[in-house]
Amino acid sequence: MDAHSRFAPRLPGPAINPIVDNSDEPQPSLSDLHDFEPKLEFDDTELLAPSPLEKDVMVGDFVLAEDPELEPEEDVNPLEDDFEDQLREQSENFQTPRNKCDFLGTDKQGRHIFGIYASRFPEKSQLEGFVREIIKEIEPFVENDYILVYFHQGLKEDNKPSAQFLWNSYKELDRNFRKNLKTLYVVHPTWFIRVIWNFFSPFISDKFRKKLVYISSLDELRQALGLNKLKLPDNICDLDDKLNPSRKPSTPPPSSNINASRQQQHKMATTHQFGVPLKFIVMNSPCLNSIPPIVRKCVDSLSITGVIDTEGIFRRSGNHSEIMALKERVNRGEDVDLKSVNVHVIAGLLKSFLRDLAEPLLTFELYEDVTGFLDWPKEERSRNVTQLIREKLPEENYELFKYIVEFLVRVMDCEDLNKMTSSNLAIVFGPNFLWSRSTSTSLEEIAPINAFVDFVLQNHKDIYLIDVNQRTVSVD
């Protein structure tokens, strides 16, 4: 089915937190769910009298049974809060035509994270086109494993989707959207979400059901995603403060962050290679040509015939617990042997190294230049990219970036088998090569970053024509 057909965010959630038995999946929330329920929610007119569904037909993750009926829970008296009306003005002010969904960053396993907000839904008549635009924005990324965060609160009477709309949208959704979705976080769930889920539950596979995790606070979300900073709309933050009044901000003042970081680096064991500046590694580890030992080991292991041509290399997520265990061993100074380690774990270890650097490999200084890549005239891009890389990158960053690019080019050479084109590799590595100093990177910013990396991969011979020691030569 065409990915651009009707689609809606996966809104429903289970009545209780699911148990995720796969070590790769984040654990569900253990905190209590909030039962703050507004008067205006999803259109539930089809719940008590659903449209006839096909009998015993398998559709994706759903198995359609004969005439499913919802049995409403008795003695339920949810609170009818009016926070959506209170926050409506803020949500409307925040919404812009280009902000249908947000790119929130990458999680601890390097998977892209996208945020969808109920407060941004348009009226029902425009909802189908709205979600089609969301599909266009994230479709290039869903060929890889990805995470979806749905911020539930903020619906109004004129934009609440019907249960039938959700059902039809899911059935028509492209396979990659369903298959490669690894976790669906529902933030600030309500009682009605659980009712909706009970209605759909008989038709949903156990595999898909395990992907859903309830999140009751933004602190819990940050911890689950492994992101200390989340750029979220004010109305979401205000609602979180209201629902979690006892939770105080855990972020210390910037000055104390800087002091703590300096103290931590001072106490850091010289064997550390993860979570430290690249210069720190070069100064304290046996780095040949500024290449950290663990990076060289990963690249050597992944370059072997039969490994480098693995289909989906760098797309699939490796076992998170194995990756974390290897990182701890490396930071203790142990000599790790990767010969018997799964290819996706090694690939995840390499991505984790880049993501854990104290400063991105392409440096904060180049962020504005790189995010302006698509605005450059095409005839000037080669010259500008070459100058940025040769003249503005510190020597150790230049050497490591060159080393990884040359490896990724070898991965590209096997694209007939591994399906990893320059564009696919750019989507995976772009957010791990460069990110913003102060805020999360938006979809508008990630596009030029990925395009920049794609350009480098396709034009690497021209960019790296001369040796690093000759980088001071001017470029005409």
Swiss-Prot record:
The modification Phosphoserine is found at residues 29, 31. Keywords: Developmental protein, Gastrulation, GTPase activation, Phosphoprotein. Disruption phenotype: Defects during gastrulation. SMART domains: RhoGAP, SEC14. Residues 1-35, 241-266 are annotated as: Disordered. GO terms for biological process: imaginal disc-derived leg morphogenesis; negative regulation of endocytic recycling; negative regulation of stress fiber assembly; positive regulation of synaptic assembly at neuromuscular junction; Rho protein signal transduction; small GTPase-mediated signal transduction; ventral furrow formation. Residues 276-464 form the Rho-GAP domain. Residues 91-244 form the CRAL-TRIO domain. Residues 257-266 have a biased composition (Polar residues). One of its GO terms (molecular function) is small GTPase binding. The record marks 315 as: Arginine finger. The modification Phosphothreonine is found at residue 251. One of its GO terms (cellular component) is cytoplasm. Disulfide bonds: none annotated. Signal peptide: none annotated. Functions as a GTPase-activating protein (GAP) for RhoA/Rho1 during gastrulation by converting it to an inactive GDP-bound state. This is Rho GTPase-activating protein 68F. It comes from Drosophila melanogaster.
